[in-house]
A protein has these predicted regions:
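Short, conserved catalytic-motif segment at the N-terminal edge
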Residues: 1-50, 72-74, 88-89, 132-137
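Active-site SXXK
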Residues: 2-5, 19, 25, 49-79, ...
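Short, small/polar residue-rich loop motifs at catalytic or cofactor-binding pockets
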Residues: 13-16, 308-311, 405
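Short, surface-exposed loop or secondary-structure junction motifs
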Residues: 33-37, 91-308, 313
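Short, glycine/proline-biased beta-turn/loop segments that scaffold the active-site neighborhood
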Residues: 74-90, 181
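Peripheral terminal and inter-domain segments
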Residues: 298, 341-496
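Short, well-ordered beta-strand elements
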Residues: 313-316, 320-329, 466-469
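Contiguous hydrophobic, core-forming segments of folded domains
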Residues: 322-353
């Protein structure tokens, strides 16, 4: 395990990592590398807080399961029973959607629908805005017909828990999950950085170097707390793993019936060729906050977490009484994939001798094959030369535009060109460029992954002028859900 961690750190040049393993109920090994903030001199420890991101979802599900045990709600309760003002786009879905549906990604919405109200940070969207926005997000598929990952319904789940429990979500999570399990260092809601033993800063690459982006003095209570807002150190995450592998470590915390419900396959998930090739997997499904599959004939319960500059993985192998946690504070998706796979194979197929180098090469071959097949890489128009857009040629597009859930944006002359600016998400601002006969936005403070096409439809046939957006890179993070936006022109540009 130590060699695998070292190999991943060396190959990907990581600024730091925290990894721990539990076997037979005991913490057997800790591997800590690097600094909480690159160049800061403070080493990563078992108490250093990392954003666990979507590994929060299993904690939210556990909170709800505790409330089911307490008789405060039932999994098949209509959401509207607890949140009377809750609305989805279709009335029949509003009536039928149950508490369980909030946790299993079966809403019919597209992947990451509404995530632009959560990221990039900071922005001015509130938890109430996010929930109200669901009434305006048009589904891509029928309710309960297929899997598509979402975050916003976990935010709704947090509010259901708050309504049933009579206290804010963060208070309940601390009381019902952190305190009884001894996860005393974990943080959710608003908290002071000075009150934590150590806090890992997210890192991004700048000119070939890792640059830390530390928190301010106070970490605010963010709308996405129930979907991905928890921070924990490695020690506390290993306590989380221990109680799932051995309920005897937390007697009475959760009934056997609810433990079974959480780890039941509620929603089939599409299984990739990689899962078949690497792991000989036969199924893939979502439980309540957990992903369920098999690796080399062994059951695996796991989840990952991804936020800008923070990646995590929690993997449980219950039949082997083993599990491990990976915490990263850099944009290191491939590093997480490679290390998680390598460590899992140490348990499920130790005789195969799979190494970090093996999976690094496998990912490279996979990418090369996808590029050759034309299923990966930027399309031709995204690679075309770019030039500043001309305001005169965009006259009909200039003005103020409004989307019913995202709010107002402006497309207006500025600095000798044209700028796109969001009123509520200030980092979604940048110059408008022309490329391949189309227009796009190159956001000032975001990477090329965030670039977005702007497509204009003039007024006609009784319909107003409309502005829509789309990802320039089809492989970009689905949380840039531009495709869910539909702007209508509401006014002229204000002279600067």
């Amino acid at each position: 395990m130590a060699r695998a961690v070292d190999d991943v750190v060396d190959h990907y040049g990581l600024p730091g990592i925290a990894v721990g393993v539990v076997v037979d109920g005991e913490v057997r090994q800790l591997e800590l590398r690097g600094e909480a903030a690159a160049g800061g001199g403070e080493p990563i420890t078992g108490d250093t807080l990392f954003k666990v991101a979507s590994n929060t979802k299993a904690m939210t599900a556990a909170l709800l399961a505790r409330q089911v045990d307490a008789g405060l709600l039932a999994w098949d309760d209509p959401v509207a029973k607890h949140l009377p003002d809750f609305r989805m786009y279709e009335d029949w879905v509003t009536r039928e959607i149950q508490v369980r549906d909030l946790l299993i990604h079966n809403s019919g919405l597209g992947p990451g629908a509404g995530d632009l109200m959560l990221w990039p940070e900071p922005n001015s969207f509130t938890r109430e805005d996010v929930i109200a926005g669901l009434a305006h997000l048009k589904p891509l598929w029928s309710f309960r017909s297929r899997y598509a990952y979402d975050n916003n319904l976990y935010i709704v789940a947090g509010e259901v828990a708050a309504a049933a429990g009579g206290a804010p979500f963060d208070v309940l999570l601390r009381r019902e999950v952190f305190e009884p399990l001894g996860m005393d260092g974990c943080r959710v809601g608003e908290w002071r950085v000075a009150d934590a033993a150590s806090v890992a800063a997210p890192h991004a690459r700048r000119d070939g170097q890792w640059v830390a982006r530390p928190d301010g003095e106070v970490v605010a209570d963010m709308p996405m707390s129930a979907a991905g807002g928890v921070r924990c150190g490695l020690g506390d995450m290993l306590r989380w793993v221990q109680q799932w592998l051995d309920p005897g470590t937390a007697p009475g915390w959760l009934s056997e019936a609810q433990r079974e419900a959480v780890w039941t396959a509620h929603m089939p998930m599409p299984m990739s060729q990689r899962m078949r090739d690497w792991n000989n997997s036969h199924f893939y499904a979502y439980g309540y906050g957990w992903r369920l599959t098999d690796v080399d004939g062994t059951a695996k319960v796991s989840h990952t977490g991804t936020l800008s500059g923070m990646y995590s993985a929690v993997t449980l192998l219950p039949e082997l009484d083993a599990g491990f946690v990976i915490l990263l504070h850099s944009n290191a998706g491939q590093a997480r994939t490679v290390l998680e796979q390598t460590l899992a194979k140490l348990f499920t197929a130790p005789d195969e001798g799979r190494t970090v180098a093996h999976y690094v090469d496998a990912l490279a071959r996979e990418r090369e094959q996808a590029l050759e097949a034309g299923t990966a890489g930027l399309p031709a128009d995204a690679q075309a030369p770019r030039a500043p857009a001309d305001a005169a040629s965009m006259e009909q597009m200039l003005g103020t535009w409004r989307d019913p859930w995202f709010g107002e944006v402006t497309v207006c002359p500025a600095d000798g060109g044209v700028r796109f600016e969001s009123a509520r998400s200030p980092r979604l601002a940048g110059p408008v460029l022309a490329a391949a006969g189309r227009l796009l936005v190159d956001f000032d403070t975001l990477g090329p992954d965030a670039d977005a096409w702007l497509d204009f439809s003039p007024a006609g046939n009784g319909l107003p002028a409309r502005l829509t957006m789309a990802k320039v890179d089809p492989e970009a993070d689905f949380s840039y859900d531009y495709e869910d936006l539909g702007f209508v022109r509401t006014g002229d540009c204000t002279p600067r």
